[in-house]
């Protein structure tokens, strides 16, 4: 048993399957340390679930991973599957995910002088379909708004002072308090007085005969969308610089 390094007791039922020659001594040692030992399975026994505390596989052939689920079903809750192979088997060593999918956890791979590949995996002591009751302590259903509703309410009228009531809206300050017509006040400091004092250019006959010549912005001929606010050509159609502006016959006719 030293080569297997297993911990068995007289209360355990063990299944041991071996294709290695001269394994009778190992089987006899397992019988001495366990309650019962089974060395082969019939088809009917393969369908029995939760039957063994320990399943031991000793083989010189590559392990068939398709049998993992069958061995897992044969194990009782908390049981162990141990695989001993006389040859190195990297595929088995790296198949931890296959064992997990098959229902086994705590996958471990080792080796010793006798067995080049040793794998152990456990069946959980809990069932994947088990459910348990969780006792959640009851909480008091206090009204979360009670502390707010019970407090003193603020009168919204107290938030407005007398100065706030008599002050004029900011929208009336744009015309310097001279009425709806926007004119510069006597002591204007916003720049409106200077704007009103500027002489706006007027359209002359020369400008119509020879339009756009000497334009400072160069956009006069492009139409109102590109003309300055004080452009004398505003309202006139587009034209070519230096060519007389030709007004259509219905230019001064109201559209309505």
Curated annotation (Swiss-Prot):
Q: Which GO cellular component terms are attached?
A: cytoplasm; mitochondrial intermembrane space
Q: Residues annotated as region Linker?
A: 137-166
Q: Which GO terms describe its molecular function?
A: 2 iron, 2 sulfur cluster binding; 4 iron, 4 sulfur cluster binding; electron transfer activity; metal ion binding
Xref: Pfam families: CIAPIN1
Q: Where in the cell is it found?
A: Cytoplasm; Mitochondrion intermembrane space
Q: Which InterPro entries match?
A: Anamorsin (IPR007785), CIAPIN1 (IPR046408), SAM-dependent_MTases_sf (IPR029063)
Q: Where is this region: Disordered?
A: 126-148
Where is the stretch described as Fe-S binding site A?
A: 176-190
Record-listed [2Fe-2S] cluster binding positions:
176, 185, 188, 190
Bias (Low complexity) occurs at 131-144
Fe-S binding site B: region residues: 217-231
Alphabetically sorted, this entry's keywords are: 2Fe-2S, 4Fe-4S, Cytoplasm, Iron, Iron-sulfur, Metal-binding, Mitochondrion
GO BP terms: iron-sulfur cluster assembly
Renumbered to this chain, motif Cx2C motif 2 spans 228-231
Known cofactor(s): [2Fe-2S] cluster; [4Fe-4S] cluster
Q: What are the boundaries of the region N-terminal SAM-like domain?
A: 1-136
Residues that, per the record, bind [4Fe-4S] cluster: 217, 220, 228, 231
Q: What is known of its domains?
A: The C-terminal domain binds 2 Fe-S clusters but is otherwise mostly in an intrinsically disordered conformation.
Its quaternary organisation is:
Monomer.
- Annotated function: Component of the cytosolic iron-sulfur (Fe-S) protein assembly (CIA) machinery. Required for the maturation of extramitochondrial Fe-S proteins. Part of an electron transfer chain functioning in an early step of cytosolic Fe-S biogenesis, facilitating the de novo assembly of a [4Fe-4S] cluster on the cytosolic Fe-S scaffold complex. Electrons are transferred from NADPH via a FAD- and FMN-containing diflavin oxidoreductase.
In the record, the note on similarity to other proteins reads: Belongs to the anamorsin family.
Its name, as the record gives it, is Anamorsin homolog
Which organism encodes this protein?
Answer: Dictyostelium discoideum
Q: What is the lineage of its organism?
A: Eukaryota, Amoebozoa, Evosea, Eumycetozoa, Dictyostelia
- Gene this chain is encoded by: rsc43
């Amino acid at each position: 048993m030293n080569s297997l390094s297993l911990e068995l007791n007289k209360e355990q039922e063990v299944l041991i399957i071996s294709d290695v020659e001269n394994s009778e001594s190992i089987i006899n040692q397992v019988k001495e340390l366990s309650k019962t030992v089974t060395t082969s399975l019939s088809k009917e026994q393969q369908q029995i679930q939760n039957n063994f505390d320990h399943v031991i596989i000793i083989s010189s052939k590559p392990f068939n991973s398709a049998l993992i689920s069958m061995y897992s079903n044969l194990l009782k809750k908390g049981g162990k599957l141990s695989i001993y192979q006389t040859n190195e088997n990297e595929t088995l060593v790296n198949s931890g995910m296959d064992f997990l999918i098959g229902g086994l956890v705590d996958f471990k791979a080792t080796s010793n002088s006798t067995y080049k590949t040793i794998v152990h995996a456990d069946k959980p002591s809990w069932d994947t379909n088990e459910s348990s009751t969780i006792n959640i302590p009851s909480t008091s259903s206090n009204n979360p708004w009670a502390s707010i509703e019970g407090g003193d309410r603020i009168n919204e009228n107290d938030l407005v002072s007398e100065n706030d009531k008599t002050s004029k809206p900011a929208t009336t300050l744009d015309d310097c308090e001279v009425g709806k017509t926007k004119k510069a006040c006597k002591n204007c400091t916003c720049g409106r007085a200077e704007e009103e004092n500027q002489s706006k250019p007027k359209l002359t006959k020369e400008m119509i005969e020879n339009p756009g010549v000497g334009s400072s912005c160069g956009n006069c001929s492009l139409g109102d969308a590109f003309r300055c606010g004080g452009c004398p050509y505003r309202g006139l159609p587009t034209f070519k610089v230096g060519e007389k502006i030709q007004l259509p016959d219905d230019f001064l006719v109201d559209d309505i």
